Amino acid sequence: MIRDVELAEEALSKKAGGPQGSRSCLCLSLFSFLLVAGATTLFCLLHFGVIGPQREEQSPTGLSINSPLVQTLRSSSQASINKPVAHVVANINAQGQLLWLDSCANALMANGVKLEDNQLVVPTDGLYLIYSQVLFRGQSCPSTPLFLTHTISRIAVSYQTKVNILSAIKSPCHRETPEWAEAKPWYEPIYQGGVFQLEKGDRLSAEINLPDYLDYAESGQVYFGIIAL
């Protein structure tokens, strides 16, 4: 019986190719295991996004941060941060004259613009938007014609002469209010704005002819400013 088993094992060993055949089977099994393990690992890495194409970050608006639109807006925003800008408001305590303030809550001075002698001083050459608004108010129309003027002037470093670059004139009263008639208040706003090529050191002023008629009842009604483009 034992001899028969030994003969059977010997025959099986010869059929399989002996010890070398067993070694080949072991190598094949090990290779198959490694192949399956590698494929499983690769699948997991791809599934969880560890490798492979990365998801694009998005801005709060839902646009990809790498899109041309977002890049353009970002560049424009960064460039605007360094551009000169100024917004000054009228001093409501300066009765009888128009004085500008740069140190109150609604005022803004940035990137080199200065307020000197009631004038804005331009820090760099370039195109600038210049703007200003005034608001006049009266209780009634006087017997003589009433003309209100608002002028923005420039004193250029190249020729040192005061030149009006924006000017407006209005007449709120077309006729005198009769003595027997009830006085009716009138309001007259004047807004001006334009784009100009300015030089470093240029001085800009915004002036009126009748400051006693300025209306300071509400903040933000009388202002003057420049923005580099």
UniProtKB/Swiss-Prot annotation:
GO BP field: extrinsic apoptotic signaling pathway via death domain receptors; immune response; necroptotic signaling pathway; negative regulation of protein-containing complex disassembly; positive regulation of apoptotic process; positive regulation of canonical NF-kappaB signal transduction; positive regulation of extrinsic apoptotic signaling pathway; positive regulation of JUN kinase activity
Cytoplasmic side: 1-30
Entry comment on modification after translation: The soluble form derives from the membrane form by proteolytic processing. The membrane-bound form is further proteolytically processed by SPPL2A or SPPL2B through regulated intramembrane proteolysis producing TNF intracellular domains (ICD1 and ICD2) released in the cytosol and TNF C-domain 1 and C-domain 2 secreted into the extracellular space.
Extracellular compartment residues: 52-229
Span of domain THD: 84-229
Record-annotated membrane-spanning stretches: 31-51
InterPro entries listed in its UniProt record: TNF, TNF_alpha, TNF_CS, TNF_dom, Tumour_necrosis_fac-like_dom
Gene Ontology CC annotation, any one: cell surface
Entry-listed glycosylation sites: S76
GTP-binding recorded as keyword: no
Localisation: Cell membrane
Membrane topology, record value: Single-pass type II membrane protein
Family affiliation: Belongs to the tumor necrosis factor family.
Function, as annotated: Cytokine that binds to TNFRSF1A/TNFR1 and TNFRSF1B/TNFBR. It is mainly secreted by macrophages and can induce cell death of certain tumor cell lines. It is potent pyrogen causing fever by direct action or by stimulation of interleukin-1 secretion and is implicated in the induction of cachexia, Under certain conditions it can stimulate cell proliferation and induce cell differentiation. Induces insulin resistance in adipocytes via inhibition of insulin-induced IRS1 tyrosine phosphorylation and insulin-induced glucose uptake. The TNF intracellular domain (ICD) form induces IL12 production in dendritic cells.
Name this polypeptide is given: Tumor necrosis factor
Native organism: Cervus elaphus
Primary gene name: TNF
